[in-house]
């Protein structure tokens, strides 16, 4: 069970969006590497990074910022946004990423995801971003008719390390995680699920530690951390206590 702090990159800066709208970006830190170090010093064990410009462009745009993050932290880093080819995946893993997140390509070319899992075992996650229960692609700019569970089940047995499920309708507005949809997905597949979008308070962290949610790998937090709505120490203490209970 992991709480992943998020760094979303736009034009080289650490930002948060509301509902995935690039025009509603709030800059929280102009130095993403410093933010990565701060999260590590606060006790977080992983880092979730998204190249927002890259998600729209279909290729890496904020590569220099990601490289700076990788140099700044010893924590494992997972990256999504604009990664669409095997060469691109291999390049990023060689540069120090622990895990690559594939979103649009999981819809457009699922065979590539399966091949990536074979070639890079344990290093590939699938990002499923949903609006109204349907999968969105190309930086959330395009809607599909594909259902979340339908897409997730395509990768059963492929070796996907995790599914990162984001409810776009809740992203960045602090309304709480969509637990009904997240747990429905977690129950429908054997792949570990990471909840994203809307995490608002310690109540969401507590919910994540309840027995019904213990199939989850964890949750991603952005605005709630940046705005001080969640105290890192309190959140991490809750998770550590829950882990002890699971071990027992």
Curated annotation (Swiss-Prot):
One of its GO terms (molecular function) is 1-(5-phosphoribosyl)-5-[(5-phosphoribosylamino)methylideneamino]imidazole-4-carboxamide isomerase activity. Its EC number is 5.3.1.16. The active site is at residues 8, 129. GO terms for biological process: L-histidine biosynthetic process; L-tryptophan biosynthetic process. It catalyses: 1-(5-phospho-beta-D-ribosyl)-5-[(5-phospho-beta-D-ribosylamino)methylideneamino]imidazole-4-carboxamide = 5-[(5-phospho-1-deoxy-D-ribulos-1-ylimino)methylamino]-1-(5-phospho-beta-D-ribosyl)imidazole-4-carboxamide. Keywords: Amino-acid biosynthesis, Cytoplasm, Histidine biosynthesis, Isomerase. Pathway: Amino-acid biosynthesis; L-histidine biosynthesis; L-histidine from 5-phospho-alpha-D-ribose 1-diphosphate: step 4/9. GO terms for cellular component: cytoplasm. The keyword Amino-acid biosynthesis applies. It is found in: Cytoplasm. Belongs to the HisA/HisF family. HAMAP family: HisA. This is 1-(5-phosphoribosyl)-5-[(5-phosphoribosylamino)methylideneamino] imidazole-4-carboxamide isomerase. The lineage of its organism: Bacteria, Pseudomonadati, Pseudomonadota, Alphaproteobacteria, Hyphomicrobiales. The gene is hisA.
């Amino acid at each position: 069970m992991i709480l992943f702090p998020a760094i979303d990159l736009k034009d080289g800066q650490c930002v948060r969006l509301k509902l995935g709208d690039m025009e509603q970006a709030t800059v929280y830190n102009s130095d993403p590497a410093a933010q990565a170090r701060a999260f590590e010093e606060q006790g977080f064990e992983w880092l979730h990074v998204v190249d927002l410009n890259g998600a729209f462009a279909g290729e890496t745009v904020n590569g220099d910022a990601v490289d700076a993050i990788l140099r700044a932290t010893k924590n494992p880093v997972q990256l999504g946004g604009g990664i669409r080819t095997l060469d691109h995946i291999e390049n990023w893993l060689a540069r120090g990423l622990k895990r690559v997140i594939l979103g649009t390509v999981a819809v457009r070319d699922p065979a590539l995801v399966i091949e990536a899992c074979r070639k890079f075992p344990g290093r590939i996650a699938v990002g499923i971003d949903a609006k109204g229960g349907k999968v969105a692609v190309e930086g959330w700019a395009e809607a599909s008719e594909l259902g979340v569970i339908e897409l997730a089940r395509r990768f059963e047995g492929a070796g996907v390390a995790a599914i990162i499920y984001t409810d776009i309708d809740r992203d960045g507005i602090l309304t709480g995680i969509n637990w009904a949809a997240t747990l429905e997905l977690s129950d429908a597949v054997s792949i570990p699920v990471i909840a994203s979008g809307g995490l608002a308070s310690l109540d969401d962290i507590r919910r994540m530690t309840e027995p019904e949610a213990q199939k989850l790998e964890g949750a991603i937090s952005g605005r709630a951390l940046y705005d001080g709505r969640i105290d890192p120490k309190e959140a991490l203490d809750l998770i550590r206590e829950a882990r002890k209970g699971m071990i027992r």
